[in-house]
């Protein structure tokens, strides 16, 4: 038990903090003495500071396990409960508070104070126990009535708010959706009420306040069908704010006080002339009166026009025929604000003298409006002639009427370069008003062009040629824009003529403008037709294999089959032409192989049942097709004079013919075929049917050997067969051949008399 007063404990604590800081204050004796029990109240309160007990201070603290943390409210008084609570909080903080509800109970038992074990001497403990016994007042049990006096509920806002708060503290937000009737409010206030007591309170409330205390549960009131049919008359209901027109032509809005057929007693004075403000519409007199009444009162607010054209509204104060004495000064010119209308001056004076306006409107030379006091030159003012005809820089504040000769200087100019580009900004070119900038004004400079072509037209006799564009624009054969450094054929560069007018496979890097400028019309049309635009699945090329074709027996494939789709084309051009009426692209195929000479049906193996099925459906889904022949035997699909394999290798049926026989047959075919018809393609698959093949820069010709033609058929068979399948070896070509017209640049030179190179046969001089 502490024997020090609170003042002594505070002084010791402050001294310890000044010497060692906050950590020293935690281990000081004053901190231990701050834990006080219920017995310290009487001892410290009875002993004054003048009469100190000369006892040694207790150095041992009360053990924490001996402190009664849990104390019931039924055994301690409110004062002792407060002391125990504060003592527990000073030792363990807020975690020592374990009481869930601080509401006191109605019945209290005898006060029993827990004994606090102290470590003081027995004599001091005995003295303190005597003091506690003398000062302790034993309270007897007081019997209270459990059933309190019933208080009638009154449906006031305070009771509703209290009940709502209590319900929300228990049930949360869901309590706001509960019923708010008188019975529910009574049950919330006292949950222990019986149904008989609740009904008594409700009847008592209704006897005082009537049926106004009845409240639903927030739902809509029940309503049945409208038997009277008032909903049909909603369109004919009267509007709260009406609109009518007076006899003078003005519009009046608001609550209509007009005569109505549904109202009796307002017939009197309907058709009479009434003085004052007219608040009845003209439609009333037209409906109920035979003769329209004449209103003799003048219009309070009139609208007149001044000599400058401005409108003036308000009380008209001009000259009148009904007023005498206002004739003097009618036709005189007055200074100041004009409040007399121009109509009055024209009526009595015969002419209207236009007066100058304070605020004027004008238009600049650029078409912008300027309003305000125009400080332009006037014939009535002398001394403003100086500089009136000169051209000024800056913002234009004069109108178009007093504008000087010429146009004012613009801050931001617009110029055109030699290439046709537009340049805006402050002009830095040559000017008549600046001297010293003549040098080099007519010379052609390299670099960015920031001077407009107007300077050359004004100061120089001729316009220089524009420089080559750094970034050019061209149009590819597939209608795509190509921008960047132009790598096509140029008139300034020599040696780029070969191959410029030939069809190349791969990505086009030269535009159509190069073809139109350097090639003839026939070659240009040929190159354009071979490089058709393929949009989506609308490709001109035939496709073989497992493909979702259109036009067959499969249902559901016709939807969207004739539309342009993006992505990889999976429908051939032949299917597109046969099923769609108007294909979006050219009907010519990319691979110039005619169906007459190379039929697609020649490359398939069909059984009799298959042929019968193909006669019924010729546009179905295709698969791996082989040569159409009934002589194919063996496990490797080999036949007489044929080599099977992929579709990229097609060979002539007669390979046992000699070279001369083949040449004669080709000449006879060339005579029969017209010149416009092009020979069938020798390259199938990914390559084009004619033209140059990019890559290692080799050209196709009649005198050049390579990976195609008769020699290729001998040297590169797809599969090695038996000896009977190989044709005999033909004699080598040793006849004199004509020299080609084209030149091949590189190691062979660049002149026409230079060496001619064939890729398979080596160099030839």
UniProtKB/Swiss-Prot annotation:
Residues 38-63 have a biased composition (Polar residues). M-repeat repeats lie at residues 240-289, 300-349, 358-397, 411-460, 470-519, 530-580. Residues 1-215 are annotated as: N-terminal domain. Residues 1-107, 165-229, 306-328, 367-413, 611-637, 656-765 are annotated as: Disordered. Residues 216-586 are annotated as: Middle region. It holds the Pfam family CsoS2_M. GO terms for molecular function: structural constituent of carboxysome shell. One of its GO terms (biological process) is photosynthesis. N-repeat repeats lie at residues 7-22, 79-94, 158-173, 196-211. Residues 735-765 are annotated as: C-terminal peptide. Has 3 domains; the N-terminal domain has 4 short repeats, the central region has 6 longer repeats. The C-terminal domain has 2 repeats and a highly conserved C-terminal peptide. The C-repeats serve as the encapsulation signal for the alpha-carboxysome, and are able to target foreign proteins to this organelle. This is Carboxysome assembly protein CsoS2. It comes from Prochlorococcus marinus subsp. pastoris (strain CCMP1986 / NIES-2087 / MED4). The gene is csoS2.
